[in-house]
Amino acid sequence: MSKTTSSDDSRDGEGDKRLRSTTKSTWLSFLKSIATFSGDLSSLTAPSFILSSTSLIEYSAYWAEHPELFISLPRGETPLERQLLVTKWFASTLKNQYAARNERYGSEKKPLNPILGELFTGKWNTDIGEDTELTSEQVSHHPPITAYHIYNKKAGVRLEGYNGHKSGFSGPQIHVKQIGHARLILEPHNEVYYITFPLVTLEGLWYGSPYIELGKKSYIISTSGYLTTIEYSGKGYFTGKKNTFKATIVNAKTKSEPIYRIEGSWTGMLKYCTFEDQKRSAWEDFLDCGNYKPVNISVAPIEEQGEYESRRVWKNFAVALDAGDYAAASQEKSKIEEGQRELRRQEEEHNEVWHRKYFEWKDKDEGFEEATKCLRQPVKEGFWYYLR
């Protein structure tokens, strides 16, 4: 197995530095085209120079890039302690998922839309002698949806979920509504934590340096009765700070006053205190998101990967893009996309459907619906279940 981070760490970078002066006019033309587009922006073909050489399917690895936190979740002695640990682990996933590329390269890049059936698998080594394993599959292309399953058998920690998105242009921003939810299972305690996702806003478009800000709320709802509500906000024209994170933990069953408050930046320092003692001296460090380094995922070398594994699918495109040869990159991308269109035509002609390898859709997730009753409106939503 070869080691590399699951994000754009090893493959995006040099192309960024060559980008701005040579492609500024093309960038502005692209912005004008999306400003007049009324549908879901994910269906648009983006020019190669704004693309990442990493497929969106790899983003599922961000959930476990701090494997020591992931496997430690069952160690909390009480349901409340475990709720706090799960909240800390979730907060640790945000920076790399939404901000690391901008900090590393100076601007956000559009990840590649995975092809239907695309796979990304790998594992993290841990100090308990059992690997944490990831399996992710692109289960839908229109709309794009990735299903994923992350498991450490010895620790008894399992995460499964699916992410899709719908995006639209609004003024100077692109808003991305994340579709789906995740379920974190702590097997030693027979607990399930249902996780929803924040709104993603792409800022800085007209300056040619796009970056991500998070908005609205997301929730972590435990079958033990505890609820974490996280509110995200960013810097406005006159007020606010970038990447603001404010959370409360309550017992949703008893509808008590909040027990904990957690505040700070999801790219910097988070502090917490009990709700009863909110004096400044009572706030303690919760998580230093800015200096919490991710752990690389191990993936098979490209030459050992199957034909649908992500880095093999996009190998030629990535080589061309990293060399700054945007014409060749566009040609390679078009070749892949046309091959997919031909497969769909053949399936339609022979009245066939694509069969998913690892996941199965069910129209109901009754546990999620029951858990979200503690919110103002319960959420009725299906789920992509992992085929064990």
From Swiss-Prot:
The UniProt record lists the keyword Transcription: no
GO cellular component, one term: cell division site
Keywords linked to the UniProt accession: Lipid transport, Lipid-binding, Transport
Pfam families listed in its UniProt record: Oxysterol_BP
Domain of life: Eukaryota
Gene3D superfamilies registered for this protein in UniProt: 1.10.287.2720, 2.40.160.120, 3.30.70.3490, 6.10.250.1430
GO molecular function, one term: oxysterol binding
Gene Ontology biological-process entries: intermembrane lipid transfer; lipid metabolic process; sterol transport
Source organism: Schizosaccharomyces pombe (strain 972 / ATCC 24843) (Fission yeast)
Protein name: Protein kes1
Family: Belongs to the OSBP family.
Keyword Transport belongs to the record: yes
Lineage per the UniProt record: Eukaryota, Fungi, Dikarya, Ascomycota, Taphrinomycotina
Function: Lipid transporter involved in lipid countertransport between the Golgi complex and membranes of the endoplasmic reticulum: specifically exchanges sterol with phosphatidylinositol 4-phosphate (PI4P), delivering sterol to the Golgi in exchange for PI4P, which is degraded by the SAC1 phosphatase in the endoplasmic reticulum.
